[in-house]
């Protein structure tokens, strides 16, 4: 089975109670495209130094070869690269292919403040924006994977877990909402 982005589905599926780990930052790809293609409009709204710093930060993708190496060494662990559907699209794919639900804590999903500002400027949800360089990992030992990645200078954090039902729940300060297919 192939994803819309042409990436093959993960060979190992997530199972209920597996941790879901975010690696990298959401919507960096979208922010970079915006900085490249809408620079003139952005310069009217944001200071040049802010845009330059945003471009520098959003260009720092995690090393995919290190991520793949860590995942391959850990039994029952799967890697899900984000694509054009962003974080939410990747969460949908992970849960649909694995036939599990999820409980994901929105406030735990890593997204840069600069990216939030740029997405807000264009009225785009950063969790649905293109997110090359962002990955989800489903693992039975999430804390260990998170620790190994962080020790390798790769930003990673547990954002939730796979559930035994089919409910795809996003949990935030405002309560719970269901993830809808984009």
What spans do the regions from the language model cover?
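Helix-biased detector of long, well-ordered alpha-helical tracts
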Residues: 1-182
């Amino acid at each position: 089975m192939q994803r819309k982005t042409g990436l093959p589905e993960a060979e190992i599926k997530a199972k209920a109670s597996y941790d879901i780990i975010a690696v990298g930052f959401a919507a960096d790809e979208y922010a970079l495209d915006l900085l490249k293609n809408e620079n003139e409009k952005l310069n009217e709204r944001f200071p040049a130094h802010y845009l330059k710093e945003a471009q520098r930060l959003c260009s720092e993708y995690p090393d995919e070869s290190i991520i793949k190496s860590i995942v391959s060494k850990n039994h029952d662990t799967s890697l899900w690269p984000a694509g054009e559907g962003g974080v939410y699209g990747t969460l949908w794919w992970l849960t649909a292919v694995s036939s599990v639900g999820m409980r994901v804590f929105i406030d735990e999903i890593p997204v840069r403040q600069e990216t939030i500002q740029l997405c807000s400027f264009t009225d785009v949800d950063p969790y649905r924006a293109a997110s090359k360089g962002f990955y989800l990992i489903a693992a039975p030992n999430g804390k260990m994977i998170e620790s190994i990645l962080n020790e390798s200078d790769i930003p990673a954090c547990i954002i939730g877990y796979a559930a035994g039902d089919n409910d795809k729940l996003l949990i935030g300060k405002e309560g719970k909402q269901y993830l809808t297919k984009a």
